Amino acid sequence: MAEEQPQVELFVKAGSDGAKIGNCPFSQRLFMVLWLKGVTFNVTTVDTKRRTETVQKLCPGGQLPFLLYGTEVHTDTNKIEEFLEAVLCPPRYPKLAALNPESNTAGLDIFAKFSAYIKNSNPALNDNLEKGLLKALKVLDNYLTSPLPDEVDETSAEDEGISQRKFLDGNELTLADCNLLPKLHIVQVVCKKYRGFSIPDVFRGVHRYLRNAYAREEFASTCPDDEEIELAYEQVAKALK
């Protein structure tokens, strides 16, 4: 007889109305992990302006997101992810860790470069900061278009060409994607709204990656509304003057 699954509840930041999902890439990351694991779980949005007594008791520190697994409370996104990968494991649940270590660091610089770009108000610095973001996107594009070791036929003398894989580590979503995709989504929404900047078409690998990601429910259905992201960056994104 299969062991009964403990109750799993993910507490995430609420949006501007105090109910729908708010802008938080860490919350979306864990939401995606739980969905990909195929586990039964609930998601509770927490209004950061009006925390309920229950939430205060469960997590006095109030750091979101946090996870309730049975009667255990888990905090810190990285530690929660490690915990879920350890307890929700094969054969009952899929392993989500990337096979190639490089997949975990692909695109790692993008969010920092984006933050510097969007927070800048000095027009004289804008071009260089935009170039920094483009350079980080180019590194990701190179990774996505370069074949992974398991795509390379070592017996063939022919050039393997461009990788056609769907995601960072192959044709299935992994923990690496759960980390990167929510941040890439924010970059797209915020840059378009506050800088009129879109990821250039020349980065075909990045565009292919995003198309494949938006076609997956686990990503598309866990994204906050664009308006929530724009609102979160309303005071952060500095006008050039």
Curated annotation (Swiss-Prot):
Residues bearing the modification N6-acetyllysine: 13, 119, 131
SS bonds (residue pairs): 24-59
A matching Pfam family: CLIC-like_N
Annotated organism of origin: Bos taurus (Bovine)
Protein name: Chloride intracellular channel protein 1
Gene of this entry: CLIC1
Segments carrying motif G-site: 24-27
PROSITE patterns: GST_CTER
Keyword check for Membrane: yes
InterPro entries in the record: CLIC, CLIC-1_C, CLIC_N, Glutathione-S-Trfase_C-like, Glutathione-S-Trfase_C_sf, Glutathione_S-Trfase, Thioredoxin-like_sf
Modified residues (Phosphoserine): 121, 156
Major localization class: nucleus
Catalysed transformations (reactions): L-dehydroascorbate + 2 glutathione = glutathione disulfide + L-ascorbate; chloride(in) = chloride(out); iodide(out) = iodide(in); thiocyanate(in) = thiocyanate(out)
Modification type Phosphotyrosine: residues: 233
Family: Belongs to the chloride channel CLIC family.
Keyword Transcription applies: no
Region called Required for insertion into the membrane, residue ranges: 2-90
N-acetylalanine: residues carrying this PTM: 2
EC number in record: 1.8.-.-, 1.8.5.1
Primary enzyme class: oxidoreductase
BP-aspect Gene Ontology terms: chloride transport
Annotated function: In the soluble state, catalyzes glutaredoxin-like thiol disulfide exchange reactions with reduced glutathione as electron donor. Reduces selenite and dehydroascorbate and may act as an antioxidant during oxidative stress response. Can insert into membranes and form voltage-dependent multi-ion conductive channels. Membrane insertion seems to be redox-regulated and may occur only under oxidizing conditions. Involved in regulation of the cell cycle.
Compartments it resides in: Nucleus; Nucleus membrane; Cytoplasm; Cell membrane
Domain GST C-terminal, residue spans: 93-233
Topology term for the membrane: Single-pass membrane protein
Gene3D superfamilies recorded: 1.20.1050.10, Glutaredoxin
Note on domains (UniProt): The active G-site contains a monothiol Cys-X-X-Ser motif which mediates glutathione-dependent redox catalysis.
NCBIfam families found in the cross-reference section: O-ClC
